[in-house]
Amino acid sequence: VLDEDKTLLETSAQELFHPGSAQKLFVAAAAFNTLGPQFVFRTEVLFDGAIESGVIKGDLVIKGSGDPSFRLEDLENLVLQIKKKNVKEILGNLIIECSEFDEIRMGPGWIWDLQRHGGNIPVEAFVLNQGLVDVWIKPSDISMNAPHVEIDPLVPGICVSNKAIMANIDPYEKSLKVRKKQQRGKDVILVEGALSLKSRPLKFSIPVQYPAHFAATEFSLLLKKHGIKHEGKILFDHNSCCKEVLASHQSAPLFDLVKKMLKFDNDMYANCILKKIGRIKFGKPGTWPNGAQVVREFLLDVAAKEVDEAVIVDGSGESCFNKISPETVALWLKNIHKKFVYA
């Protein structure tokens, strides 16, 4: 009982257990303590050279901020801001700068080969739509034929292995399975099972292997859509020298992002926030270890424990390496309830 500081039941209190999604509570509190609830992620488009007669005579750079909430409409808004500056052509390359985070996209202890919806999603500093593509499965007309499979948006490097069939079964029978396997650097989406002839179109959200590549492809397509010519290369750089801001987008305040993270148990939000607090705390690219260090130190400080065997390696709690004792969690909850200004 928190208000009375009373223990009603105790068993295996000092043993280490996997915290699962409870770990997001520690990330949320550490983020508020490190960044503040009004902190925002800021994604910028920069350029070098000069703009002459609507032509950028140099490179165009998107500097990712690690914003987990960045969506396609936000990316299109950046392109519209560029268009309002009367930019009609980019002579240089399109550079995606991901220096905010390190290059280790997958968390320690994750199952790299099997990625479920919303989980084990690779983390990069420039992520669009949480690194997910939509897979639409639509019925065909003839029994035993394969259903139609569509990827939206269609991203290079994704291929479909459609082994499903159409069948005269109940449309509510859940016999269709969609999952992803990595194969020689490609994302292979496996569609198996049976789909009812009477089924409505079904949507599955699947993680991509390289979120920044996915986002860069969409940005290039949006430039073309809005009449901005670009025939250069798409490059990925961790140390761009461009400094002049051409367009920018900022996320909702951290308070709102954390609320969404906790309400919907969002793994991508938790992992991006973990790396971001490592980036801000240590002044260098956010990594799994430095973000986890901030969370663990804050956890033990609030729990008022000098020595603890708690292990924190990611933000989402997905990793099998994460371990914490019920005693530490209870002490942390008690003290956060009493003292923490954001509780």
Label each PLM-derived region with a short phrase.
Residues 1-11:
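A short, well-structured edge-of-sheet supersecondary motif
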Residues 9, 60, 242-243, 313-317:
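Surface-exposed aromatic
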Residues 10-30:
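Short active-site loop at a secondary-structure junction
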Residues 11-17, 205, 316-319:
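A short glycine/serine-rich beta->alpha loop
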Residues 21, 212, 322-325:
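Short, conserved glycine- and acidic-residue-centered signature motifs
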Residues 27-32, 273, 329-333:
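Buried hydrophobic packing segments
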Residues 34-308:
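Conserved serine DD-peptidase/penicillin-binding transpeptidase domain
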Residues 294, 307-343:
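C-terminal soluble interaction/assembly domains
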